[in-house]
Amino acid sequence: MSDYKSTLNLPETGFPMRGDLAKREPGMLARWTDDDLYGIIRAAKKGKKTFILHDGPPYANGSIHIGHSVNKILKDIIIKSKGLSGYDSPYVPGWDCHGLPIELKVEQEYGKPGEKFTAAEFRAKCREYAATQVDGQRKDFIRLGVLGDWSHPYLTMDFKTEANIIRALGKIIGNGHLHKGAKPVHWCVDCRSALAEAEVEYYDKTSPSIDVAFQAVDQDALKTKFGVSNVNGPISLVIWTTTPWTLPANRAISIAPDFDYALVQIDGQAVILAKDLVESVMQRIGVSDYTILGTVKGAELELLRFTHPFMDFDVPAILGDHVTLDAGTGAVHTAPGHGPDDYVIGQKYGLETANPVGPDGTYLPGTYPTLDGVNVFKANDIVIALLQEKGALLHVEKMQHSYPCCWRHKTPIIFRATPQWFVSMDQKGLRAQSLKEIKGVQWIPDWGQARIESMVANRPDWCISRQRTWGVPMSLFVHKDTEELHPRTLELMEEVAKRVEVDGIQAWWDLDAKEILGDEADQYVKVPDTLDVWFDSGSTHSSVVDVRPEFAGHAADMYLEGSDQHRGWFMSSLMISTAMKGKAPYRQVLTHGFTVDGQGRKMSKSIGNTVSPQDVMNKLGADILRLWVASTDYTGEMAVSDEILKRAADSYRRIRNTARFLLANLNGFDPAKDMVKPEEMVVLDRWAVGCAKAAQEDILKAYEAYDFHEVVQRLMRFCSVEMGSFYLDIIKDRQYTAKADSVARRSCQTALYHIAEALVRWMAPILSFTADEVWGYLPGEREKYVFTGEWYEGLFGLADSEAMNDAFWDELLKVRGEVNKVIEQARADKKVGGSLEAAVTLYAEPELAAKLTALGDELRFVLLTSGATVADYNDAPADAQQSEVLKGLKVALSKAEGEKCPRCWHYTQDVGKVAEHAEICGRCVSNVAGDGEKRKFA
């Protein structure tokens, strides 16, 4: 028997079947770096319309975790897809470098500032530590395949950025938004510092819940108010609190003006409570025998005075809108030094903002004999004992509730009034303007808008001062006596900023006030406070975006971070930008959910359910991680586990195999000379290119909408259904057996070429390494990298007016599916081995029959059978299989007649009819020795 293998056009490519991503990706990265791929992209995109995604800076501390990977990969997908869409989209990664976590790390190794090192040396150590952390994280981010200006990132500790942060504060002061006050702020006794809203987390905590009686100073006045004369025992107003330790700072009792308050007689005394809460309070304190003596509106009780249960003063009843009937007694213990609501109402009534608690969380000397020097969290029992001793405690019980804790120490925090600097939300209309700006931003998902609106509407003034060593100094001078800011504050801040730009923040602490204040230096003191780190990152729209040359003065189009950043970076950026410029710093804000394990549980080292991105990249490769990120709906929680990553690897193999099939069958194809014009192509090939065109429209729309899981689903559908189970199957016969340079084969290769050109670009934003690899194997002249180009524009499709249009082939797909079912059953019944051993008769109603007949002898190639005949539906024999999908179709199968051709494997009657090629069929003889077969349709 002759060997006809050499006459076949067998697929061939150097593109490997196995990805071996973990091994290959580092080599690709090295090439990207050596070539300066990021620089090549920037040069290619110069002059295009811009799209600026401003990087929210991760904190320069510790290794990157899976959440960091999600964030950076999503950003990279957007940047690359925007590049392919014709934008110049520079990406400048950044890091947050000041603040407490770095201080704590340095303290652990070197001690607190002033112990072994001066404050200046301590800052230098912090800077050194942050730099090493940046280097470690940068390597991992690059390994993810994220393209950016990694050689020139922005760091909030860059001297120029530090200077620009000071300038941002100057602008806010110039616009009248800064004020100083002894306001209660979140205070961590372990950090010994104020905390920003975003540094507070909530955990369940068990606290004592107490009902306390404040006895009326003027008993007769109360009797008159309630219209009663006979009351058995003293009258008291009852408060309820879960923070007994704050009672030494009590300066009032808040009640609601419109609530009805009842005077209730119980055993030996009378108590005042909100009428609607009488029943629940009586149950709580264990009193079943009580009488309501009278009721009045809360407004009637305003400014009546009540004796503090153990301190030597009395306090007024005041009216507040914050009082509710949700719990308690309807009367709220008010300590202006320990709560924001209390502070606001205290200001209204001119109450003292008492703060008897020191920075370490212990009571200051002179607070109360048994409390001085005691930690507030240990003081509850002492306070409760005092109340019991004074006869003021009506009830005590334990309750579990959500309590604010320090994000760093996980320990409970307190509200503590300290002299601080604030950005005011209302004195110059910052709140109103911010709410207006929010409406002009596109929030993705859209629920983000309501979330941040609620936060802005209800947030207190922003405390921006910190009592820390490693941070950007506020750079302010205040008068020794009046504590007023220097009248030339803005000018002085610019002078400080210039020095910081040269020498870093240490320039402020080294500065002798006389150098810039001259003779006034004796009258002013330098403010020792540093800025909240959220001010550092929140001002990067000004300190970075406005000044980096690659952004060319354009504002950021997008901020993209985790959903916790509504109260973090999105908020601080909005506040600062609106306070500085009167407008939001972004046009779009996209948020992603947190990563959870396969069971939906929060990731935790203690549970052992964390997934290390480094491990995934070392085992499976970064492209698998990128594909998992893209295929997961980021608007909710993002589940990841070994099993989920394995599924991503399976999907990857399907895409890789499709790409490999395309490349292997483009062997020997030179698009410059072998391309077939669309009008001369086989109809099925034009249909396949049209499928790619339709897929591209969907994929580009999904990229534009940031629906990356939709991109992946559409890509998978294209590879698996439209190509894998239909087109690529059908063309194997023509591709392998037709004459190498025939129109039939070149038409097919032309289609594969167009499809490959489109596919490699669809993949590029997500499967960046694999797309780069595919790009290197594609035929034809091209730029060195897929990332410098744009979406492929060479796709075309069938016109609706053509007889064999898309609808025609969609119906053929269904017919093919029905035939496959019949063949599978015949194989199961051992009637045939493979589909080429079968011949089918399609009994079809006239309309469908006409379509099938139009394909002539080429129908069998579509059905992958050796024979295919069309007959009248009504002539179908009893054993013909009725289609469930196409009502006007029945399928009958028989074994194909004739012999099997060893070259094309089809069974035909003309095998051996040509003496010179006695072993092969007539079609193969034509392809081997003649002009080659002609294909028109398939």
UniProtKB/Swiss-Prot annotation:
A motif ('HIGH' region) lies at residues 58-68. Coiled coil: none annotated. One of its GO terms (cellular component) is cytosol. The modification N6-acetyllysine is found at K183. ATP binds at K605. The keyword Metal-binding applies. Zn(2+) binds at C901, C904, C921, C924. L-isoleucyl-5'-AMP binds at E561. Binds 1 zinc ion per subunit. GO terms for molecular function: aminoacyl-tRNA deacylase activity; ATP binding; isoleucine-tRNA ligase activity; tRNA binding; zinc ion binding. Its EC number is 6.1.1.5. A motif ('KMSKS' region) lies at residues 602-606. It catalyses: tRNA(Ile) + L-isoleucine + ATP = L-isoleucyl-tRNA(Ile) + AMP + diphosphate. Keywords: Acetylation, Aminoacyl-tRNA synthetase, ATP-binding, Cytoplasm, Ligase, Metal-binding, Nucleotide-binding, Protein biosynthesis, Zinc. It is an enzyme of class 6 (ligase). It is found in: Cytoplasm. PANTHER family: ISOLEUCINE--TRNA LIGASE, MITOCHONDRIAL (PTHR42765:SF1), SOLEUCYL-TRNA SYNTHETASE (PTHR42765). Catalyzes the attachment of isoleucine to tRNA(Ile). As IleRS can inadvertently accommodate and process structurally similar amino acids such as valine, to avoid such errors it has two additional distinct tRNA(Ile)-dependent editing activities. One activity is designated as 'pretransfer' editing and involves the hydrolysis of activated Val-AMP. The other activity is designated 'posttransfer' editing and involves deacylation of mischarged Val-tRNA(Ile). HAMAP family: Ile_tRNA_synth_type1 (MF_02002). IleRS has two distinct active sites: one for aminoacylation and one for editing. The misactivated valine is translocated from the active site to the editing site, which sterically excludes the correctly activated isoleucine. The single editing site contains two valyl binding pockets, one specific for each substrate (Val-AMP or Val-tRNA(Ile)). Monomer. Belongs to the class-I aminoacyl-tRNA synthetase family. IleS type 1 subfamily. This is Isoleucine--tRNA ligase. It comes from Escherichia coli O6:H1 (strain CFT073 / ATCC 700928 / UPEC).
